[in-house]
């Protein structure tokens, strides 16, 4: 049964969507290793495509994902996203290392990421989304609770993805779990916060700032991130090797 699932729903790429002041850019990152026993994949995002400048070429983000039959669950994220629903702020600050964000910054504002699953048939249909225009910082904020009511966006008017989307919120909106409808499914939406200064919502991992003005070294980020166990794959070294 496991081999059938892996062959039918192959996790092949991570699609990153990041919004600039005047456009939305996409790039695909190939899978860097899979564990068929647990239906897991490690994916490394290095931000080397589209617009963005040198900071995108240096920033590296690692996802450990697991296919569950109903979609993909993000188990781990080297930028500090929680792998499970919780109230309040569920993620660390979202900007890459060394890059600050403010309401007046042109270019990079918020990062949104979607996980794609490819099979012989398109089993989920287009992912409907639309930027919500409620202010300068909220221009590119995609709210999960309005997903099913919004017109499609993305390349050629639609974007196909799994029923799990990680997206960044804005100051004042806060983090949280936003339910939405997609092809009869109920996807989960995890939100973290973009920030404009030190007074924004604190990151989940308080032992180190994972991005921004006092970004820790790679080893510190790794140490702060792995303080809770992975019930599906306890071998931490397999995952950590992709940080190097």
Swiss-Prot record:
The residues the entry assigns to the signal sequence are 1-23
UniProt tissue specificity:
Expressed in salivary glands.
* Cell attachment site, short sequence motif: residues: 143-145
Q: Which organism is it from?
A: Tabanus yao
Every copy of the SCP domain together lies at 67-194
Q: Which domain of life is it from?
A: Eukaryota
Q: What is its main location?
A: secreted
Any one GO molecular function term: toxin activity
One GO CC term on file: extracellular region
User: In UniProt terms, what function does this protein have?
Assistant: Inhibits platelet aggregation induced by all agonists tested (ADP, arachidonic acid, the thromboxane A2 analog U46619, thrombin, and snake venom snaclecs (TMVA that activates platelet through GPIB, and stejnulxin that specifically acts through GPVI (GP6))). May act by competing with fibrinogen for binding to glycoprotein IIb/IIIa (ITGA2B/ITGB3).
Q: Which residues cross the membrane?
A: none
Which compartment or compartments is the protein found in? Secreted
Family, similarity comment: Belongs to the CRISP family.
Q: Provide this UniProt record's keywords sorted from A to Z.
A: Cell adhesion impairing toxin, Hemostasis impairing toxin, Platelet aggregation inhibiting toxin, Secreted, Signal, Toxin
What's the protein called, per UniProt? Tabinhibitin 8
